[in-house]
Amino acid sequence: MPFLGQDWRSPGQSWVKTADGWKRFLDEKSGTFVSDLSSYCNKENLFNSLNYDVAAKKRKKDIQNSKTKTQYFHQEKWIYVHKGSTKERHGYCTLGEAFNRLDFSTAILDSRRFNYVVRLLELIAKSQLTSLSGIAQKNFMNILEKVVLKVLEDQQNIRLIRELLQTLYTSLCTLVQRVGKSVLVGNINMWVYRMETTLHWQQQLNSIQISRPAFKGLTITDLPVCLQLNIMQRLSDGRDLVSLGQAAPDLHVLSEDRLLWKRLCQYHFSERQIRKRLILSDKGQLDWKKMYFKLVRCYPRREQYGVTLQLCKHCHILSWKGTDHPCTANNPESCSVSLSPQDFINLFKF
C-alpha cells in the first residue's frame, strides 16, 4: 500500500496570510515568498503585542474588581426559599444566595434593623464565612465596610462593631493558618488582604474621638431622677449602664441601684439560671450586678430586635417584617414566623 502522507516526524508546513489568501511559507533556498518574511515577522510582533495588551488589561481589571465597592446582588424585598428540587423548580436556595439577594445594604441604614444585620454578620463571620460563595463573601465585606463608615460618621454602636471586627479577624486568622485543609474561595492573598482591611477598620474605631454636640440644651443630668431611672431601664446591656454611671457622679449612684440590675437579670435570664448563679454581698443581700456579669459569661443573653426577617409558612417566602410579599393565604400575617439571626442561618442547613 503506497504511503500517501508526509513523514509523521516532519516539522510540518508554515503558512502566511497574504492579500491573495493563505500561502505556504518557504525558506530562502527555494527563493519563494522571501519578501513575505518581514511582513510575517511584523505580524508575529503585532500578535505578541496584542497578547501583552490583553494580559495587561486583564490584570488591571482584576485589581479593580478586588477593590470595587459594587455589590453583585439583587435588591429585593423577599425571596423564595426552597430546600429541594421539584419538577417546576430545580436546585435549592443557599445562605450565600439569600445573603446576596436580600437588601442588607439598605437595612443597615434603618436603626430598627441595624442590630439585626450586625448580629447576622457576626454569626456569619464566626462559622459560616467559608460556606458563602465568592460573590457573597465580597458582598459581606462591602456591607461590613458600610457599617464601619456609618459608625465612624454617627459615632454610635462603637463597641458592637469592635466585637464584630474582632470576631471576623479571629476567624480569618484561623482560616489562613488552615489553608490547604479547609475550603477557601479565592486566592490566599485575597484573604490576607481582608485581614489587613479588618485591622485597619479596628484602628479607625480605636482612634475615634466622640465630639460633643454643638448645641447646649438639656442633658440627662438635668432631668428628674425618676426619668433618669426610666431611661436606664431601657438599656439592655449592663456595660452601657456602667459606662453611663461613669459619665457623671450623680448617674453613678443611680447605676448601682439593685432593683435596676435585678430587672436586667430577670429580663435576660430565666429563674432557673438565676438560682444557679446566686452571689451574696457583704451585707448578706443578693448582688445583682455581679450576678448579671456572671450569668452573661455562662448563658446567652436575650435577643430582641425592632424589625426582623420573617418566613411565611404558607408560601415559603422570606422577607423583612412589615413588607408585603405575594401570598395566596387568606391571612398572610398569621402564617409569618419571625426569625432570629441564628434561625436565619439554621434555615439553610441541609
From Swiss-Prot:
Entry keyword Protein biosynthesis: no
Short motif (Bipartite nuclear localization signal): ranges: 275-290
Organs and tissues of expression: Specifically expressed in cardiac and skeletal muscle.
Gene3D superfamilies in the cross-refs: 1.20.1280.50
Organism superkingdom: Eukaryota
Main localization, broad class: cytoplasm
Any GO molecular function: ubiquitin-protein transferase activity
Domain spans labelled F-box: 218-266
Key words of the record: Cytoplasm, Nucleus, Ubl conjugation pathway
Pathway(s) of this molecule: Protein modification; protein ubiquitination
GO CC term (a single one): ubiquitin ligase complex
UniProt motif (Nuclear export signal) ranges: 164-168
Subcellular location: Cytoplasm; Nucleus
InterPro entries listed in its UniProt record: F-box-like_dom_sf, FBX25/32
Motif (Nuclear localization signal): 57-62
Keyword Cytoplasm assigned: yes
One biological process term in Gene Ontology: response to electrical stimulus involved in regulation of muscle adaptation
Complex formation: Part of the SCF (SKP1-CUL1-F-box) E3 ubiquitin-protein ligase complex SCF(FBXO32) formed of CUL1, SKP1, RBX1 and FBXO32.
Function of the protein: Substrate recognition component of a SCF (SKP1-CUL1-F-box protein) E3 ubiquitin-protein ligase complex which mediates the ubiquitination and subsequent proteasomal degradation of target proteins. Probably recognizes and binds to phosphorylated target proteins during skeletal muscle atrophy. Recognizes TERF1.
PANTHER family: F-BOX ONLY PROTEIN 32, LD30288P
Name used for this protein in its record: F-box only protein 32
UniProt gene name: Fbxo32
